[in-house]
Amino acid sequence: MPSTLTINGKAPIVAYAELIAARIVNALAPNSIAIKLVDDKKAPAAKLDDATEDVFNKITSKFAAIFDNGDKEQVAKWVNLAQKELVIKNFAKLSQSLETLDSQLNLRTFILGGLKYSAADVACWGALRSNGMCGSIIKNKVDVNVSRWYTLLEMDPIFGEAHDFLSKSLLELKKSANVGKKKETHKANFEIDLPDAKMGEVVTRFPPEPSGYLHIGHAKAALLNQYFAQAYKGKLIIRFDDTNPSKEKEEFQDSILEDLDLLGIKGDRITYSSDYFQEMYDYCVQMIKDGKAYCDDTPTEKMREERMDGVASARRDRSVEENLRIFTEEMKNGTEEGLKNCVRAKIDYKALNKTLRDPVIYRCNLTPHHRTGSTWKIYPTYDFCVPIVDAIEGVTHALRTIEYRDRNAQYDWMLQALRLRKVHIWDFARINFVRTLLSKRKLQWMVDKDLVGNWDDPRFPTVRGVRRRGMTVEGLRNFVLSQGPSRNVINLEWNLIWAFNKKVIDPIAPRHTAIVNPVKIHLEGSEAPQEPKIEMKPKHKKNPAVGEKKVIYYKDIVVDKDDADVINVDEEVTLMDWGNVIITKKNDDGSMVAKLNLEGDFKKTKHKLTWLADTKDVVPVDLVDFDHLITKDRLEEDESFEDFLTPQTEFHTDAIADLNVKDMKIGDIIQFERKGYYRLDALPKDGKPYVFFTIPDGKSVNKYGAKK
């Protein structure tokens, strides 16, 4: 009698491994397992007959003859890794597991070797297929061996068509249950369903304030809004929330659009909150007439204390007529009386949620607006403006970082009070990094205090700052998308994002040589060129497409002093890209004499040295490293960041580099062999050399430029 495998198409982790195992069995022993699909979020992911536990191993055990091609202990090890580690949504842990799998697949076609896949491959492939975070990782070849192996198995119809089988079965199930009128399903890496989202009707928005440069937190918000708009075949609005003329500049607005363009984000519309100043003014008048808002001239500090203590303002019961006069005549015209007042929403001054304690919704500001000039003397606050403009522009889903969660009730109250349509809110966690400030106010303070050069300083978490440090657009985008719309608030290490970047730059970064504190070595022997000799060598040994570079060979060379200090007389060392030499003498001035031994075995030498010919062709360079701007991983609410400033955050090292750097242009990324990755930031000028910024490589010992 055949067994029955029941797969839950709506399980948080779809049982692809079990499904594929059953398809393998049926391919070799037809009709051995009947495959049934259910559409029930509460049902187990998989069930074999009546068993809901350890279903994959039950299938492979029952049909052991089919899956008997691998060491049982090894199979169990990889099945365990698949079921416990490859399905998790924590990027840091998932990345470690993928690296383990990638290492195992090095020089192997399948996980356990051999010419055919085993149960280990089925379990791991199925786990990756079910994990939404893995889609972009595999597509972008973050782990090369894993991507190659995954693609190979995907070409097998038993694997590759598993998703189509699942989708078609689910569709048939829905048709038979007469639920075809529900929203169309969509492929989503983030495994969430937006409430009341309808295919083709979803509208999201990214609303940056033009008061600073785009930082990584903004990049996540922008990419998530773009993702869901595209996933539901909807629209994305890029809206500048320009309601505070004291902070905003057209310069910031232009830079935000440029950075979004670099990230591949283009809105279907670009709008401005200032486009709706008249509408928001009218809505405020409506609220006052409805008795839902009042003008208040209570001094700022006293108002703050009253809100904290749940005390009603003395102005809370002003008449509608008095409130209208102050708002439409005094505040609107910026008179002396108007400047003393603000408008507050009349919600609940005793509310447990303190954001509902009569928040301010309009203020006077005489600073000319960068778009509307001096037309307006009053401006809506963020909390009043956003729900109104969202409703006017047709936004269906407002994605906001989780620190706004307490304000969600306020957002909904504004829409209800003004009788505007409902907009759904979806919270997600902002990206936080250790020893990093994302507050625009704090970043501006550092700019004003000359602690950094500007908003594009390589120590800043702005998109421009990290790009100047050497972050690629592809690396940044892949990292942000890998985080998904998680609501878990965590402080990430910078090595995570730089590890993504390394995957992008390592295969294509030309290899160059830089020498610090050069020590001379004179080479003896007939093989040592008496005159400088140039040969063309590949810039990247593993990627000929990167091109060629000039390497000068000569009897006199220089090496790093750190290298010279650890090698001894009579020791054989390897000069990279040349051959072995035997040190025959160390002079009092530190220089050395060596004899070429090009027939020597480089595998037997302890030290492999980078070197340059000691000629006039060497190029002076400045290698710049950076540390974090603050010394503490995470600041508490009562701690001031000024008390935790890192004393020194910029470090310069003089060096000489090979002549090929003269062909570089600003922004080029290279690797100085045995030193790391670098981005060219400045060309020689006014006697200053080429300036290269270090690019962190993702190792925990070198967190975002922190000195070792």
Swiss-Prot record:
User: Which positions does UniProt annotate for ATP binding?
Assistant: 215, 403, 437-441
- Which CDD domains does this chain map to? GST_C_GluRS_N (cd10306)
Query: What UniProt keywords apply to this chain's record, in alphabetical order?
Result: Aminoacyl-tRNA synthetase, ATP-binding, Cytoplasm, Ligase, Mitochondrion, Nucleotide-binding, Phosphoprotein, Protein biosynthesis
Q: Which reaction does it catalyse?
A: tRNA(Glu) + L-glutamate + ATP = L-glutamyl-tRNA(Glu) + AMP + diphosphate
Query: Which Pfam families does the entry link to?
Result: tRNA-synt_1c, tRNA-synt_1c_C, tRNA-synt_1c_C2
Q: Where is this region: Interaction with ARC1?
A: 106-115, 141-157
Q: Does the keyword DNA damage apply?
A: no
Give its localization.
Cytoplasm; Mitochondrion
Q: Name one GO biological process term.
A: glutamyl-tRNA aminoacylation
Position of motif 'HIGH' region?
210-219
The keyword Protein biosynthesis appears for this protein: yes
In short, the EC number is 6.1.1.17
The short motif 'KMSKS' region is annotated over 437-441
Q: Which InterPro entries match?
A: aa-tRNA-synth_I_CS (IPR001412), Gln/Glu-tRNA_Ligase (IPR050132), Glu-tRNA-synth_arc/euk (IPR004526), Glu/Gln-tRNA-synth (IPR000924), Glu/Gln-tRNA-synth_Ib_cat-dom (IPR020058), Glu/Gln-tRNA-synth_Ib_codon-bd (IPR020059), Glu_tRNA_lig_a-bdl (IPR020061), Glutathione-S-Trfase_C_sf (IPR036282)
**Record's PANTHER family?**
GLUTAMATE--TRNA LIGASE (PTHR43097:SF5), GLUTAMINE-TRNA LIGASE (PTHR43097)
Give the free-text miscellaneous remark of the entry.
Answer: Present with 48700 molecules/cell in log phase SD medium.
The UniProt family comment states: Belongs to the class-I aminoacyl-tRNA synthetase family. Glutamate--tRNA ligase type 2 subfamily.
UniProt-recorded name of the protein: Glutamate--tRNA ligase, cytoplasmic
